[in-house]
């Protein structure tokens, strides 16, 4: 339901296996192995990815699977029970680069982003196409907003993993 939750919304349309599994996953209503496998079975064959996972227990395993599948670079992120970067808590990152897996924690302040409170972030949840559009516009026009920061953080991670920036911090600046 967040601003960048594209995979979950589009998986059924663009991934043949998810066409069948998606409705069953929704009916079950709990996290399953499909939440872990889905992002790693990218139909585009991406060799560089930023993937979120709901449990820190899965991060190293996912990074190792990505390495074995031939990924060149990847970041598997988790923060406070969620499968995404956070602005209100540290994010644990397991990074695959040049065949080597490393892990570290990152705080928003380390990336020159303002730490946010959960109340700050409550306003960046889209519950309709209209509110999603409003958030996108806000992220593009108000560079001090929480929406702009979360877009910069996620885009910055993609820029870094894509090899355009030499660090996550520089990726965030470029975004």
Enumerate the predicted regions with their spans.
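Short, small-residue-biased leader/transition segments that mark boundaries at the very start
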Residues: 2-7
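Glycine-rich anion-binding loops and their surrounding alpha/beta cores
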Residues: 9-175
